[in-house]
């Protein structure tokens, strides 16, 4: 079993009054045995040598927004789905994360509308493309062979976030949030941070409000990916109607995992 790795980087956790034990966990992030990627999109251009981007048809690929607007002063990238049904925009890091290395990803996002849209944030066994990880959410079927993600899909019966995963083409038992759960669904033009933390063949799912406060309970899925398979941290957004385009903004994209020989 790999060593434990920090899955919660929120400022609220540091200020939670739990003392030196919590602080020591955060010091782990500066140790030599952690591989990490942290992007606040402050450079003015997307690092295309690192990211794979996909934009179908009339969709607009992710690009850095001008920092002049106060809403973008922390560095923001935007992807646009276009107004064609089932058209998508997606962004991923390379295929170099593993459950065996306890890889974690965190994405702070906001979306322009929460009707006729599908959003996935998580790990998958291919880089960004026009195909999502989850085909259908009500009775989950998958395009990926291995991977797990937070999924929100207005084509589903319940319009809330669901934690889903697939291991060697076998679907895990997912969890769909109740409508009464904290952070159960995206809120229009409001930031939320979604975290997926792999632990060998399993994964933990958590979510945080715009000010970094934890929302609801952490969810654990078992057998939701194959720990030895390389996965790509990915954000995928798909239009679910042909009448209106959807924008998704990403404030930060983080990934970290254990470094091993």
Question: Predicted segments — roles?
Answer:
Residues 164-193:
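Short, aromatic/His-centered strand-loop micro-motif at the edge of beta-sheets
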Residues 190-204:
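Localized edge beta-strand/strand-to-loop motifs within extracellular or lumenal beta-rich domains
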Residues 47-75:
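Extracellular glycan-recognition surfaces and repeat-rich motifs
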Residues 210-232:
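Short, solvent-exposed beta-strand-to-loop segments that form ligand-recognition rims
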Residues 240-251:
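Extracellular carbohydrate recognition
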Residues 78-161:
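Secretory/extracellular carbohydrate-interaction modules
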Residues 41, 251-255:
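Extracellular beta-strand elements of beta-rich domains used
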Residues 3-56:
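Extracellular carbohydrate-recognition regions
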């Amino acid at each position: 079993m790999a060593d434990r790795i920090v899955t919660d980087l929120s400022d609220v956790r540091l200020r939670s009054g739990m003392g030196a034990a919590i602080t020591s966990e955060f010091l782990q992030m500066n140790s030599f045995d952690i591989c990490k990627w942290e992007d606040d999109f402050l450079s003015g251009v997307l690092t295309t040598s690192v990211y794979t981007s996909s934009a179908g048809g009339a969709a607009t690929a992710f690009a850095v927004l001008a920092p002049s607007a106060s809403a973008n002063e922390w560095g923001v990238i935007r992807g646009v789905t276009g107004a064609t049904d089932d058209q998508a925009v997606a962004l991923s890091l390379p295929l170099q994360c593993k459950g065996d290395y306890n890889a974690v990803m965190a994405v702070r996002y906001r979306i322009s509308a929460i009707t006729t849209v599908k959003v996935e944030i998580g790990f998958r066994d291919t880089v960004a493309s026009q195909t999502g990880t989850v085909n259908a959410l009500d009775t989950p079927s998958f395009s990926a062979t291995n991977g797990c993600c937070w999924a929100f899909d207005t084509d589903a019966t319940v319009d809330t976030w669901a934690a889903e995963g697939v291991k060697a083409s076998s679907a895990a038992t997912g969890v769909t949030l109740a409508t009464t759960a904290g952070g159960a669904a995206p809120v229009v033009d409001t930031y939320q941070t979604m975290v997926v933390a792999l632990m060998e063949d399993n994964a933990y799912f958590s979510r945080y409000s715009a000010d970094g406060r934890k929302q609801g309970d952490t969810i654990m899925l078992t057998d939701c990916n194959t720990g030895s398979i390389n996965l790509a941290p990915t954000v995928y957004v798909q239009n679910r109607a042909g009448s209106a385009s959807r924008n998704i903004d990403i404030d930060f994209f983080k990934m970290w995992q254990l470094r091993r020989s």
